[in-house]
Amino acid sequence: MAPLRILISNDDGVFADGIRTLAAAAAARGHQVTVVCPDQERSATGHGLTLQTPIRAERADELFAPGVTAWACSGTPADCMKLALFELVKEKPNLVLSGINHGPNLGTDVFCSGTVAAAMEGTLEGIRSLAVSSACFQWRQFQAAADLALEVSEQAIADQWPDNLLLNLNIPPCAREEMGALRWTRLSIRRYDEQFSRREDPRGRAYYWLAGEAVQDLESAGEGPRDWPSDVAQIHANSPSLTPIQPDLFWRGPLSGLPQLKLKDQLVR
């Protein structure tokens, strides 16, 4: 394969081991690598954009492997992608990689994920994009995830990766030889026990810390081959999960499945 122009971002920030391992692995395979990522932790920011304050970007090449061009940006992951594509990167990338996230991005958690949002921004701009996550917050060995992300991306590009298709890759916390087979998976629906820790500042004013724990994972109600496992089940089986995601969130069921609405004696149809 000819060298690719790869743009890499994340939501864990410029000092995260995951993104540095991914960038080094891509450069070692001969690709032209540019990193534009947040200058600090921006996890769970979703697809948020910075509109009320200026966005700053500083070069950060010294934090990465030789040959990698890097920028640290004061904005969100989506800001980083927009700034990269429309200002910092002079030639359009062939591939966007986001990650390696320090923790899973499974099921409906993708709606909160800054990692997935960065990849989705690439998808919306017509670039093949893959988000990759290590499915354990404590696991800090990222080489297997980096290698698998690049293998999947290179093969998907060689096999005519469809437009408007984001690939979401989650890797179990183990060595490559201990993993099961990579499989296509469906998104789970995750239910959380949301908890807030209420505290008071020195002036007696209340503030809150959000803490939640996934207590239930439901099978996806969406379309897709029913023999595919859910992404959560695949990770629980100590196997990597690859979920195809589209930006189109449109309802695909029948009209009869929607609420019947009648406004001013006129049926909504």
From Swiss-Prot:
Compartments, as annotated in UniProt: Cytoplasm
Cofactor: how bound: Binds 1 divalent metal cation per subunit.
Classification via InterPro entries: SurE (IPR030048), SurE-like_Pase/nucleotidase (IPR002828), SurE-like_sf (IPR036523)
Catalytic activity: a ribonucleoside 5'-phosphate + H2O = a ribonucleoside + phosphate
EC number(s) given by UniProt: 3.1.3.5
Entry binding sites for a divalent metal cation: 11-12, 43, 101
Record family assignment: Belongs to the SurE nucleotidase family.
The protein, known as: 5'-nucleotidase SurE
Organism: Synechococcus sp. (strain CC9605)
Organism ancestry: Bacteria, Bacillati, Cyanobacteriota, Cyanophyceae, Synechococcales
Gene: surE
